[in-house]
C-alpha cells in the first residue's frame, strides 16, 4: 500500500471527481488500515493551523464511535450509513487535503513500523480508545479554540496507528494527556473566570513550601 499522502493526492488530484464526494468514498482509501486512516481523515479538518469550520462536532461524534470500537477490540470498523453517505464539495475537500499534505509528509518522513505492542496489543488499543475518545469529546465542546489541539493529538495517534509506528502513536497519546490537562484548565477558566489550574498549583506549592 502506498503512503497515505500519496493515496490522498492521487484520489483528489489525479483522478476525475464529480462535484461532491461522500465519506464512504474517501474511506475506501483505508483498506486494511481502516482505524488509523479514519482517525487521520476525520481529524484533519480541525487539526489544521487554520481549521476548516463546521467539522469539529460531527466528526468528533464519528471519532468517538471509532474510539469505542478500538476499546472493544473490533477488527472491522462500523460507521452509520447515514453519515457515510453525507457529501462534501470536492473543491472544499481538495482544499483541506492540500493544506494537510505537507504535515502528513513530514510525519511520513520519520515513520516506520516499531514498538508494535503499542498499536497491536489489547492494552494498547484500550489506551488509544480512551485518549482518542477523550479528545473527541474535547473537539465537540462549544468553546472557541478548544478544537484544534485535541484534533492534532487524534491526527498524530491515528497516523502512528496506520503506520504501525508505536513511537508516534505513543507520542500522540501522551500529547492527548497533556491537552486533557490544558482543556480542564480552559473549561475551568471559562466557567469560573480567570483562575487556571496553573494558578491553583502555584498556590498549592506556596502552601506546601511556605513561599510568599
From Swiss-Prot:
The keyword Repressor does not apply. One of its GO terms (cellular component) is plasma membrane. It is found in: Cell membrane. Coiled coil: none annotated. It is a multi-pass membrane protein. Its main location: membrane. The chain crosses the membrane at residues 34-54, 59-79, 126-146, 171-191. It comes from the Bacteria. The keyword Transmembrane helix applies. Keywords: Cell membrane, Membrane, Transmembrane, Transmembrane helix. PANTHER family: EXOPOLYSACCHARIDE SYNTHESIS PROTEIN (PTHR41795:SF1). To R.meliloti ExoD. This is Uncharacterized protein slr1875.
Amino acid at each position: 500500500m502506498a503512503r497515505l499522502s500519496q493515496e490522498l493526492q492521487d484520489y483528489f488530484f489525479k483522478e476525475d471527481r464529480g462535484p461532491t464526494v461522500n465519506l464512504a468514498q474517501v474511506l475506501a482509501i483505508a483498506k486494511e488500515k481502516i482505524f488509523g486512516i479514519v482517525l487521520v481523515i476525520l481529524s484533519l479538518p480541525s487539526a489544521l493551523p487554520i481549521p476548516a469550520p463546521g467539522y469539529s462536532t460531527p466528526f468528533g461524534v464519528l471519532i468517538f464511535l471509532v474510539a469505542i470500537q478500538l476499546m472493544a477490540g473490533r477488527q472491522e470498523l462500523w460507521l452509520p450509513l447515514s453519515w457515510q453517505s453525507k457529501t462534501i464539495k470536492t473543491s472544499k475537500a481538495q482544499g483541506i487535503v492540500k493544506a494537510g499534505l505537507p504535515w502528513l509528509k513530514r510525519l511520513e518522513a520519520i515513520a516506520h513500523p516499531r514498538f508494535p505492542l503499542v498499536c497491536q496489543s489489547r492494552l494498547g488499543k484500550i489506551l488509544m480508545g480512551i485518549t482518542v475518545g477523550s479528545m473527541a469529546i474535547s473537539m465537540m465542546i462549544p468553546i472557541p479554540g478548544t478544537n484544534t489541539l485535541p484534533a492534532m493529538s487524534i491526527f498524530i495517534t491515528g497516523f502512528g496507528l496506520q503506520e504501525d509506528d508505536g513511537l508516534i502513536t505513543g507520542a500522540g497519546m501522551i500529547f492527548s494527556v497533556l491537552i486533557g490537562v490544558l482543556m480542564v484548565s480552559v473549561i475551568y477558566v471559562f466557567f469560573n473566570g480567570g483562575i487556571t489550574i496553573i494558578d491553583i498549583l502555584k498556590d498549592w506549592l506556596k502552601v506546601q513550601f511556605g513561599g510568599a
